[in-house]
Amino acid sequence: MVSPAQPAAAMAAFARMAKGQVRNYSAPLDMAIPASKQKYIPSSGSYPKGFLVSGTHVGVKASNTKFPDLALISSETPCSAAAVFTTNKFQAAPVQVSKKTLESRQGQGIRSVVINSGCANAVTGKGGLEDAVNMGKKVDECNGLSEPSTIVMSTGVIGQRLPISKILNKIPTAHENLASTHDAWLTTARAICTTDTFPKLLSRTFALPSSPGRTYSLAGMTKGAGMIHPNMATLLGVLCTDAPIDPSALQSLLTHAVSRSFNSISVDGDTSTNDTVAILANGAAGGAPISSPASDDYTAMQEILTSFAQSLSQLVVRDGEGATKFVTVRVQNSPDYESARLIASTIARSPLVKTALYGRDANWGRILCAIGYTQGVAPGTVVPERTSVSFKPVDGSPVLKLLVNGEPEQVDEERASVILQEEDLEIVVDLGGGEKGEQGLGGEEAVYWFCDFSHEYVTINGDYRT
């Protein structure tokens, strides 16, 4: 019990926690997954050949006394590898080290990814860089390698040094515990969580045109719930496949996939120092390597990887801090893709749009305002007289038109309220600027996924370091 003598702040924090409103920063007291999130936890998986994973307890954050906070993903054979990193100028030590490793190896011969949660190892000076290097070296030693062959990632509070001795001492244990089971993959996904309420893990099988009878697998895990507005935000992602893909092709495939997935989500508009999405391809399932962008296999792989990355990144939005809504914003009939993407991004970042959705208020004027102040769009993209906005219900019922060709509709507020009570919602913005200059015909389309802003978001982030 909390005694009356304790500070009022502590009493308030306890009260909020008792109401289930506070997500502990790292390693929640019981790691319990909310009932509403259980549906996103896979009960089984189809994992790529030759990959082994483990989640191990280190206690990076002192308050974490038993839950896994060190993840290790390893391939039994060398991999092609590629990654996309944060655009934040204060790039964390592991980002700098991993970039250097991939550049020096030219995306070849990578064997492992090691990740700690509980401390970001960002803005930690030369010592932080040494810590990141030593994490990679320790994994390489366990793999019997002398050259840098490990991608390093960290997530947590910025500006604090890692308890590096504790981590280095536990890496051999993590290596000994490597396994290929579904439980091992799920535990590893848990190990990278911070304010996440559930581990984010997906897997699937696929075939390629050149080998229709051969089955390949693709698996991925990600973390993130706040500081999410990538180019990249606090999110980490690791994808693994047993398909054979050359490094240069792998980088272009990942870059395309990330631009339409992890870089098309927003929780709060902040971009972190640590964001990294990496992919490893070991070719263990055999077949001809994917190398040329002109090949049918490349085209198929691009579609498969992009779709998979979208599904994985959407789990981050569904776990947005304090979120009650999962919102898709679709901007269509734009003269070019980039303009559509900028408009979708601006809507997704707008606090006024996000709070209106939380309040179940069909305040389409806020959406229109965001469209109108979007910076960087091509001239003539936004023309009020041909702009339309509508809500698309998830139940398949007719769209609710809010604005048509710049003219407001008589909105059925009761129906709008019913639509906004659902967890999922799609906002459709039609710019009417397609190739034929008519509504719904031609033009480019961009899609963004975001969540609403609730009271809980402020509570979570107000208590983040406490």
Swiss-Prot record:
Keywords of the record: Acyltransferase, Amino-acid biosynthesis, Arginine biosynthesis, Autocatalytic cleavage, Mitochondrion, Multifunctional enzyme, Transferase
Top-level class of the enzyme under EC nomenclature: transferase
SUPFAM superfamilies tied to this protein: DmpA/ArgJ-like
EC number of this enzyme: 2.3.1.35, 2.3.1.1
Subcellular location: Mitochondrion matrix
InterPro entries, alphabetized: Arg_biosynth_ArgJ, ArgJ-like_dom_sf, ArgJ_beta_C
Protein family: Belongs to the ArgJ family.
Job description of the protein: Catalyzes two activities which are involved in the cyclic version of arginine biosynthesis: the synthesis of acetylglutamate from glutamate and acetyl-CoA, and of ornithine by transacetylation between acetylornithine and glutamate.
Assembly, per entry: Heterodimer of an alpha and a beta chain.
Protein name: Arginine biosynthesis bifunctional protein ArgJ, mitochondrial
Protein's organism: Aspergillus fumigatus (strain ATCC MYA-4609 / CBS 101355 / FGSC A1100 / Af293) (Neosartorya fumigata)
